[in-house]
Amino acid sequence: MKKQCVAMLLAGGKGSRLSGLTKNMAKPAVSFGGKYRIIDFTLSNCSNSGIDTVGILTQYQPLELNSYIGIGSAWDLDRYNGGVTVLPPYAESSEVKWYKGTASSIYENLNYLNQYDPEYVLILSGDHIYKMDYGKMLDYHIEKKADVTISVIEVGWEEASRFGIMKANPDGTITHFDEKPKFPKSNLASMGIYIFNWPLLKQYLEMDDQNPYSSHDFGKDIIPLLLEEKKKLSAYPFKGYWKDVGTVQSLWEANMDLLKEDSELKLFERKWKIYSVNPNQPPQFISSDAQVQDSLVNEGCVVYGNVSHSVLFQGVTVGKHTTVTSSVIMPDVTIGEHVVIENAIVPNGMVLPDGAVIRSEKDIEEVLLVSEEFVEKELI
């Protein structure tokens, strides 16, 4: 049962900034890119990187996510020895142990890690869009003889205060770390991807659990303490597309990025496929009167109107004389006739009646997350 590396995937986030999209599901279960869920990218990275043992830590609204993951067969992670294991909070004698932070969620599942006695633990977040070979990061970690390796990316200075920010020497050794600083001194951001030497991780998680002043978070507590105690932390520089889709705006932007001819995120690469659960829908139907351009249209869609620069998930119907522009239409949405949709995200299963106009009244560039209340208001 011993494994060289076990991945722990944090997938319990509420995603409150995504508003109505996460009302009934955790953020990693939100649809993305015409046929995927956000978590597909991290799970596919694991599969493509040869990581065959993944613990998925869930908490907020887990039903949709649990049903989607199943036994992990979509990502070739339905293994007898290892594979995918969903790890929800659990009751221990007198109380339920809810996860209090990112570090707490790993600590509460030390028994899961103990059974594999790995050399390394890879800690991942299930709510980012990117392609990455974790095997190369592990090789880097071993080469640097690091205690901890953090994957890092340069972000815009205007965004830096949203991330864990660090400074590193030319050889990659991390010298300074601030979690979401108000006035960042660097734009080198943590991607929330860590490789720990297992004995060290276990030791510091046990120490952290005994600290009544800790918030039990990797960025706020564990990483600063490791630096303070002179452990060797290395920064692994990531080059490529990476998007934190934690807001309605950023989720829309990431979907629109897929439609660029020179997009950094290439879904059609054979060498690094992104796997998902097949929706088992019939082929899409595009009528002779329809016009579709620069768009992703998934299985089961029926299009009679005009669709431009948009992403349509499975089971979407677009009525006659309807125009959909620069929008993301989630699964099983029905759009009536003579409807106008611009710069919007339409959530799962919504029905838009004939004549509805869906666009922002304030700003032509603002992305609108459509709600039932908005549709009712438009029809008054």
Swiss-Prot record:
Q: Show the NCBIfam families listed in the entry.
A: glgC (TIGR02091), PRK05293.1 (NF003670)
Kindly list the biological process annotations in GO that this record carries. Answer: glycogen biosynthetic process
* Keyword ATP-binding part of the UniProt annotation: yes
Q: Which CDD domains match?
A: ADP_Glucose_PP, LbH_G1P_AT_C
Indicate what this protein is called per its UniProt record: Glucose-1-phosphate adenylyltransferase
This protein's gene is called glgC
> What Enzyme Commission number does this protein have?
2.7.7.27
Annotated alpha-D-glucose 1-phosphate binding sites: Y99, G164, E179, K180, S190
Q: What does this protein do?
A: Involved in the biosynthesis of ADP-glucose, a building block required for the elongation reactions to produce glycogen. Catalyzes the reaction between ATP and alpha-D-glucose 1-phosphate (G1P) to produce pyrophosphate and ADP-Glc.
Q: How does it assemble?
A: Homotetramer.
State the taxonomy lineage.
Bacteria, Bacillati, Bacillota, Bacilli, Bacillales
- GO molecular-function annotation terms? ATP binding; glucose-1-phosphate adenylyltransferase activity
Gene3D superfamilies on file: Hexapeptide repeat proteins, Spore Coat Polysaccharide Biosynthesis Protein SpsA, Chain A
